[in-house]
C-alpha cells in the first residue's frame, strides 16, 4: 500500500535535518509507525501544530522502506495542547505516551485495544474530571493487561486462590496468598489492593472514594509493575507529579 490513511495519536517527535521531524504514531489499524513530516519545523509549514505529542490526528501517509512520509494531517482532537496547560495532567500524559510506545515493541503490528485505551485516557485527562494520577494508573494497569501482563489482584497469582491477599510479588504477577508468598514479596495494604482492582476493572465509584495513602501506594505499585515488564525505567516517570 504505497499510500494509506489511518488515524492515530502522536507519541513522540524527533528532529531530522534542518526542517523535518520523525514522528512516532500509534495508529488505529496499522499499529505503531514512524514517518517523516517534511518541513514541519518551518514557521510556514502546512502542518502547523498538528503533529505534536498527544495530538489525535487523521493521517495520509506514503509508505517507505525505513520510514513513511506524512502527506496530510488533520486534527481530530488536540488532546496534547489541552492537557499541556496543567502540569500534573501533562506529566501523566507523557507517561502514557511513552508506555504506549514501549508496549508496542514491533512496528506495524496492530494494537487496537491499546490504541483505544490511549485515546480514552487522553480524553479523560483533557476533560479534567478525574484525578490525573488515577487516570494514569488505570491506563497503566489496563495497558499491561491487554499486552499480556495483567496483574492478579483478586486471586493469588500463583495458585489462583480467590481473596484479598496482602502480599505482592511483582515478578510473580500480582498478589499472592500466605501459602504461596515467595521470599522478597512485599506487604501491601488492603486499600491499595482494592484501589488497583477498581482501576483495573473501571470501577470509578470505588476508586474515587480511596484515600491519599492508598493512592500513593497504588501508584508506586503500578509503576513498579510496569517497569518490571518493560525491563527498564521510563524517562517520563521521574517528572510525574501526583497532585
From Swiss-Prot:
SUPFAM superfamilies: ArfGap/RecO-like zinc finger, Nucleic acid-binding proteins. The gene is recO. Keywords: DNA damage, DNA recombination, DNA repair. Involved in DNA repair and RecF pathway recombination. Pfam families: RecO_C, RecO_N. GO terms for cellular component: bacterial nucleoid. Belongs to the RecO family. GO terms for biological process: DNA recombination; double-strand break repair. This is DNA repair protein RecO. The lineage of its organism: Bacteria, Bacillati, Actinomycetota, Actinomycetes, Frankiales.
Amino acid at each position: 500500500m504505497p499510500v494509506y490513511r489511518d488515524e492515530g495519536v502522536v507519541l513522540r517527535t524527533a528532529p531530522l535535518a534542518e526542517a523535518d521531524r520523525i514522528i512516532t504514531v500509534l495508529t488505529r489499524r496499522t499499529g505503531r509507525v514512524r514517518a517523516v513530516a517534511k518541513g514541519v519545523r518551518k514557521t510556514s509549514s502546512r502542518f502547523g501544530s498538528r503533529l505534536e505529542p498527544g495530538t489525535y490526528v487523521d493521517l495520509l501517509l506514503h509508505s517507505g522502506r525505513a520510514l513513511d512520509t506524512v502527506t496530510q494531517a488533520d486534527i481530530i482532537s488536540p488532546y496534547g495542547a489541552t492537557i499541556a496547560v496543567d502540569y500534573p495532567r501533562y506529566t501523566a500524559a507523557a507517561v502514557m505516551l511513552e508506555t504506549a510506545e514501549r508496549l508496542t515493541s514491533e512496528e506495524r503490528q496492530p494494537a487496537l485495544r491499546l490504541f483505544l485505551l490511549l485515546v480514552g485516557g487522553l480524553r479523560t485527562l483533557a476533560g479534567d474530571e478525574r484525578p490525573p494520577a488515577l487516570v494514569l494508573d488505570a491506563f497503566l494497569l489496563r495497558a499491561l493487561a491487554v499486552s499480556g501482563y495483567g496483574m492478579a489482584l483478586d486471586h493469588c497469582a500463583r495458585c489462583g486462590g480467590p481473596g484479598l491477599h496482602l502480599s505482592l510479588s511483582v515478578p510473580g504477577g500480582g498478589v499472592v496468598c500466605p501459602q504461596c508468598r515467595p521470599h522478597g514479596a512485599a506487604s501491601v495494604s488492603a486499600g491499595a489492593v482494592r484501589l488497583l482492582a477498581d482501576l483495573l476493572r473501571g470501577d470509578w465509584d470505588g476508586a474515587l472514594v480511596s484515600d491519599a495513602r492508598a493512592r500513593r501506594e497504588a501508584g508506586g505499585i503500578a509503576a513498579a509493575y510496569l517497569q518490571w515488564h518493560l525491563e527498564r525505567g521510563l524517562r517520563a516517570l521521574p517528572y510525574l507529579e501526583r497532585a
